[in-house]
């Protein structure tokens, strides 16, 4: 289910979620939440496009990054409530409504949101309606000194991991 991951920067929260998407062979999109992010930056919007065949202009829907199986809402509390609300329908109903038209999101669909629990300056509290849509709250903490030494000894550089697909999106939906 949808999960809220709490942890300070540098704990590999993004890597964890991206790796999960790779193992499950699911489409992954990351959205960096900032104060100037707009709801349409998440859900998508209509744009004017020239039709080469007719020469006419028409409105065409351009899907936003929420159209993925696993969406990482990075630092979700850094954007105003109006923008945070763009995720509510997606998290609850696996669809988005734009300009009165409803678009289904791919299944399975999960939102993983990250939040820094220490740095509160320039943040907006998550409303209860949004917190209720998270099935899990995962707290990530610093490694112990021994664990850090083990990680450093095991890895000396950023590696390009090749994951074996454990299941497919269809397997998850069928379960």
What is each of the regions a protein language model found here?
Residues 2-35:
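Walker A/P-loop
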Residues 38-56:
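Conserved NTP-binding/hydrolysis module of P-loop NTPases
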Residues 5, 72-73:
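Hydrophobic anchor at the beta1->P-loop junction of P-loop NTPases
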Residues 49-54, 79-83, 91-175:
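Canonical AAA+ ATPase core
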Residues 74-75, 86:
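Walker B catalytic acidic pair
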Residues 50-72:
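Conserved alpha-helical scaffold flanking the Walker A/P-loop in AAA+ ATPase domains
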Residues 8, 42, 114:
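P-loop (Walker A) phosphate-binding loop of NTP-binding proteins
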Residues 15, 82, 86:
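Conserved Walker
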């Amino acid at each position: 289910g949808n999960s809220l991951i709490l942890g300070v920067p540098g704990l590999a929260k993004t890597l964890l979620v991206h790796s999960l998407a790779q193992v499950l062979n699911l489409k992954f999109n990351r959205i960096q939440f900032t104060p100037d992010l707009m709801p349409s930056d998440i859900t998508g919007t209509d744009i004017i496009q020239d039709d080469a065949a007719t020469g006419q202009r028409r409105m065409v829907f351009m899907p936003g990054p929420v159209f993925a199986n696993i969406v990482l809402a990075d630092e979700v509390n850094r954007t105003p409530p109006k923008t945070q609300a763009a995720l509510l329908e997606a998290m609850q109903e696996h669809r988005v409504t734009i300009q009165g038209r409803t678009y289904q999101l791919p299944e399975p669909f999960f939102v993983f949101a990250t939040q820094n629990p220490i740095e509160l300056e320039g943040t907006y509290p998550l409303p209860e309606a949004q917190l209720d849509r998270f099935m899990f709250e995962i707290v990530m903490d610093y490694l112990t000194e021994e664990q850090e030494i083990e990680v450093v000894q095991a890895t000396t550089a950023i590696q390009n991991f090749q994951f074996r697909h454990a299941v497919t999106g269809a397997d998850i939906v069928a379960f």
